[in-house]
Regions:
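Rieske [2Fe-2S] iron-sulfur-binding domain
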Residues: 1-94
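C-terminal catalytic domain of Rieske-type non-heme iron oxygenases
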Residues: 10, 70, 75-326
Length: 326
């Protein structure tokens, strides 16, 4: 193995049965459960029972179908179209590529993850990560204890964007010398990678959320959430209370504890955000009204949907004329 990231169509070249059902792990051989055709980690066909029944089969012609793939900035990118391409720097653009490189995601270690089947369209799931206006209402007993609601810094990067949520700890940090400032102690950066991925570096790790449409039902989707631990410390012992507490957490807490913290954050998404999203879906399906309203304090929502529309060859969302409201 040369250590290079590769991606393949998960289908045996014999009769198309999925070769691997596990989401993650390590194997020297991947064996199809149907007829035991075997492949190595590079996707090459290395064995098949009764090979003589297939004549002079050239194994080099029957490896797993490889997909365009690239590992960059600690993240894995793959194109599901075998004839497509992957150019991460072109996808992200120069400015966002520099930011992702600076995060050093490759040094983070995986804590775990979860998968949710949700009764809402995948775009409604993305919307929940696009504003903090709802924090003091929907999250009044959870995230509102740590974040300022309806406050964010927002920037676009072509099709993508970055929103930084404001933590209440920023009130203490503003009194510190600038050389002790740490962005993830004062805020939570939320990157949206068009069209369906959220990347959130936190003070002790990283959350990645991907929303996949249900091909049979546009009113459902699957959210896959992954958690990662951040290894480096966040300051010096003589710096400040919050930084020192976080250092202690990183240096002494078992990974199981960090995983529980991450799982708790994911549960808020599942039990609060996605419950609201499912309610929105029911309203949309009722036919009672044909549009919703995005406020000026919700710029990410404007960008989400205008970017979707542009990709579909549609015009931008219309601006609301307040004088025409009933």
């Amino acid at each position: 193995d040369d250590g290079r990231f590769r991606a393949f169509v998960n289908a045996c070249r014999h009769r198309g049965v999925a070769v691997e059902e596990e989401e993650r792990g390590t194997k020297r051989r991947f064996v199809c459960p149907f007829h035991s055709w075997a492949y190595d980690p590079q996707g090459a066909l290395v064995g098949l029972p009764k090979a003589d029944h297939f004549g002079e089969i050239d194994k080099e012609c029957f490896g797993l179908i490889e997909l365009p793939a690239e590992e960059k900035y600690g993240l894995l990118f793959a194109n599901p179209n075998p004839s497509g391409t992957v150019d991460v720097d072109r996808l992200l653009g120069e400015d966002l590529s520099k930011e992702f490189e600076a995060w050093n995601f490759g040094a983070y270690g995986r804590l775990g993850g979860d998968r949710y089947e949700v009764d809402c369209n995948w775009k409604l799931a993305m919307d929940t990560f696009g504003e903090t206006y709802h924090f003091t209402s929907l999250h009044k007993d959870s995230l509102a204890n740590f974040f300022e609601g309806n406050v964010q810094c927002y920037d676009t990067y072509g099709q993508h964007h970055r929103m930084i949520l404001c933590k209440k700890a920023i009130q203490e940090m503003r009194e510190w010398p600038e050389d002790r400032w740490e962005i993830t102690l004062a805020g939570l950066p939320v990157y949206w990678i068009f069209p369906n991925s959220i990347v959130m570096p936190s003070d002790f790790g990283l959350y990645v959320v991907r929303a996949y449409p249900d091909e049979e039902n546009p009113g459902r989707h699957t959210s896959v959430i992954s958690f990662y631990a951040r290894g480096e410390s966040l300051g010096t012992a003589e710096s400040n209370t919050i930084t020192t507490e976080r250092q202690a957490l990183l240096q002494t807490a078992p990974l199981e504890v960090l995983a529980e913290v991450a799982q708790g954050f994911a549960a808020i998404i599942r039990d609060e955000d996605y419950v609201a999203s499912a309610s929105q879906q029911r309203s949309a399906e009722s036919g009672a009204f044909d549009h919703v309203i995005f406020g000026r304090n919700e710029p990410a929502l404007h960008h989400y949907h205008n970017t979707y529309r542009a990709a579909l060859g549609m015009g931008s969302l219309p601006l609301l004329d307040p004088t025409s409201m009933n």
